[in-house]
Amino acid sequence: MGNCLDSSAKVDNSNHSPHANSASSGSKVSSKTSRSTGPSGLSTTSYSTDSSFGPLPTLRTEGEILSSPNLKAFTFNELKNATKNFRQDNLLGEGGFGCVFKGWIDQTSLTASRPGSGIVVAVKQLKPEGFQGHKEWLTEVNYLGQLSHPNLVLLVGYCAEGENRLLVYEFMPKGSLENHLFRRGAQPLTWAIRMKVAVGAAKGLTFLHEAKSQVIYRDFKAANILLDADFNAKLSDFGLAKAGPTGDNTHVSTKVIGTHGYAAPEYVATGRLTAKSDVYSFGVVLLELISGRRAMDNSNGGNEYSLVDWATPYLGDKRKLFRIMDTKLGGQYPQKGAFTAANLALQCLNPDAKLRPKMSEVLVTLEQLESVAKPGTKHTQMESPRFHHSSVMQKSPVRYSHDRPLLHMTPGASPLPSYTQSPRVR
């Protein structure tokens, strides 16, 4: 696909282990993982409780990455057969990177099977001229070919035949969080489901951040959070992932790349990347879950507003919090839990990166919120008044500052892309 890297090219990623401390149990898991067959028929991972593990190779050649024993190398014809020649009626979504199709493979051999039989998968086909180039494609294969966790999307295999670049993932029937929050006609998510999704996403980020060789996700957003049939959240699209700082380094200096509205301000301004950059992005998504609004909103007469700038004045005020709560919740949420979630978002969005909590700390709070939000749990409902979307935006017209050093923006991508793509900062 265009100017591809040759087989000896290196991928810029440092050591990273697929094992982290569990924020809920406090126990470590080891790098001794084994793949087993889950309910869907696809390979999942079981973990040993051995606390000893070592780092993965710092740099790997393309040949080493593509020879991962955890991934199947598909031929282009196999994926053509699996998707019925990429027929439009199998199209799941489309974005700047290309298209995603539903496909079927045999559970045992992983070869193409008849539509409706075998295992359903999502096949992402990159456009040669798309925004997600070979380097990002290879980075995703590199990370997901080694990392395995219940809250990371499972990469089944890939195709690198000629200029064709495809990725084969487990199928996520509920699609992206972005669709559920913002797509017209979507069934509103209950408060309990929103907290469940937040917990799952937080577990995925905690796993990446607390691995022995840290991984910074760098593109955390609603479009990259995919949901299975039970609304369990899994992180997808690792094309922008970056190895965390090593040794005495406190940050990684890198080209500014991410998504407009989600990227941490200090990263946009300086290119200094830390795990706290991901924490900021998580705060934005948590704010989207609370408010039902996009990170960047241009619905008010075409003027673009930052959700963070607009909502921040209300997050720490119990009496005014109802003004930013998603009206689609119909007032059905615990007042105390909503205020705790709002305060947590405020902490994640602290302009001073050092004062933001760790993802493991965020996870502890979210798990407490999830436990009291489960159906059947008694809590105080907070009735929010009915008001029109645009009138709320006018209550606090903090306009997004366009003098920030933002770079070129392109659409983001995920195995099951959203109907409307979030702009990516480059």
UniProtKB/Swiss-Prot annotation:
Induction: Negatively regulated by AGAMOUS (AG) in floral organ primordia. Induced by flagellin (flg22). It catalyses: L-seryl-[protein] + ATP = O-phospho-L-seryl-[protein] + ADP + H(+); L-threonyl-[protein] + ATP = O-phospho-L-threonyl-[protein] + ADP + H(+). The modification O-UMP-serine is found at residue 253. The active site is at 219 (proton acceptor). Gene3D superfamilies: Phosphorylase Kinase, domain 1 (3.30.200.20), Transferase(Phosphotransferase) domain 1 (1.10.510.10). Involved in disease resistance signaling. Contributes to pathogen-associated molecular pattern (PAMP)-triggered immunity (PTI) signaling and defense responses downstream of FLS2. Acts as a BIK1 decoy and enables Xanthomonas campestris AvrAC/XopAC detection; X.campestris effector AvrAC/XopAC-mediated uridylylation promotes the formation of a complex with RKS1 and RPP13L4/ZAR1 which, in turn, activates effector-triggered immunity (ETI) against X.campestris. Promotes, when uridylylated by AvrAC/XopAC, the release of ADP from the inactive RKS1-ZAR1 complex, thus activating the resistosome. Belongs to the protein kinase superfamily. Ser/Thr protein kinase family. This is Probable serine/threonine-protein kinase PBL2. It comes from Arabidopsis thaliana. The gene is PBL2.
